[in-house]
């Protein structure tokens, strides 16, 4: 399945949670989910009982859409997490968090992961001094992530940094906002990653 490219706020209404897809509108309380907190469609306000499989599938879809990955990418990451020693669900979340586009978002240089992905693909981001234009690039602990010189005054990046003052920066990155760079200091612990996803259902889905 290809990456979803439709109206992103419909996804949030479908799942009933914020997926951080419309950063500034969400912070201002103006997102579609804030205005209409029920699924889209004629019968969206009705809540039916969801099956176990439906619950598992929903959690997988939430994670996919939140991090902006395709089905193929998601399956590959899950397979890698399953091969490693440790909690598969936690390892999956850590692998998703290590994506370059996500790190750019976590450092506050973009209001959404979608915009962070655009910054990466358009060549606005350096990793340890080298330009990297692959959103799925895996960032290792200690890596320096920097906005290229000519883009440091980009108004959208500046606005994102201003909004970060409202939400704060996650504990596993150190950021020099004025200089437009940050260090990915370590992999996050699961309890530090505040996302509306219950990864145990994803593990159950792929373990069938």
UniProtKB/Swiss-Prot annotation:
- Designated gene of the protein: rpsD
Pfam families (UniProt xref): Ribosomal_S4, S4
Keywords attached to this Swiss-Prot or TrEMBL record, sorted alphabetically, are:
Ribonucleoprotein, Ribosomal protein, RNA-binding, rRNA-binding
Official protein name in the record: Small ribosomal subunit protein uS4
What's a GO cellular component annotated to this UniProt protein? small ribosomal subunit
Domain (S4 RNA-binding) ranges? 98-163
Q: Report the sequence similarity comment from the record.
A: Belongs to the universal ribosomal protein uS4 family.
Instruction: Indicate the quaternary assembly.
Output: Part of the 30S ribosomal subunit. Contacts protein S5. The interaction surface between S4 and S5 is involved in control of translational fidelity.
Record function comment: One of the primary rRNA binding proteins, it binds directly to 16S rRNA where it nucleates assembly of the body of the 30S subunit.
Which molecular function GO terms apply here? rRNA binding; structural constituent of ribosome
Supply the InterPro entries for this chain: Ribosomal_uS4 (IPR022801), Ribosomal_uS4_bac-type (IPR005709), Ribosomal_uS4_CS (IPR018079), Ribosomal_uS4_N (IPR001912), S4_RNA-bd (IPR002942), S4_RNA-bd_sf (IPR036986)
Annotated GO biological processes are:
ribosomal small subunit biogenesis; translation
NCBIfam families from the xrefs?
A: PRK05327.1, rpsD_bact
Q: Which organism is it from?
A: Campylobacter jejuni subsp. jejuni serotype O:2 (strain ATCC 700819 / NCTC 11168)
């Amino acid at each position: 399945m290809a990456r979803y490219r439709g109206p992103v706020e419909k996804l949030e209404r479908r799942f009933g949670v914020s997926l951080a897809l419309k950063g500034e509108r969400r912070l201002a309380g103006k997102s579609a989910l804030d205005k209409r907190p029920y699924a889209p469609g004629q019968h969206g306000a009705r809540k039916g009982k969801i099956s176990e499989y439906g619950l598992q599938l929903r959690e997988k879809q939430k994670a996919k859409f939140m991090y902006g990955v395709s089905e193929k990418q998601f399956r590959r990451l899950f397979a890698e997490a399953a091969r490693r020693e440790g909690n598969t669900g936690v390892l999956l979340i850590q692998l998703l968090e290590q994506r370059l586009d996500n790190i750019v978002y976590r450092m506050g240089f973009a209001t959404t992961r979608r915009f962070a992905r655009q910054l990466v693909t358009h060549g606005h981001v350096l990793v340890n001094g080298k330009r990297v234009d692959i959103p799925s690039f895996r960032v290792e602990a200690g890596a320096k992530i920097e906005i290229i010189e000519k883009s440091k005054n980009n108004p959208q990046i500046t606005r994102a940094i201003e909004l970060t003052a409202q939400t704060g920066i996650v504990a596993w990155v150190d950021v020099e906002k004025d200089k437009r760079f940050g260090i990915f200091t370590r992999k996050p612990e699961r309890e530090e990653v505040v996302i509306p996803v219950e990864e145990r259902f994803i593990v159950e889905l792929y373990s069938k």
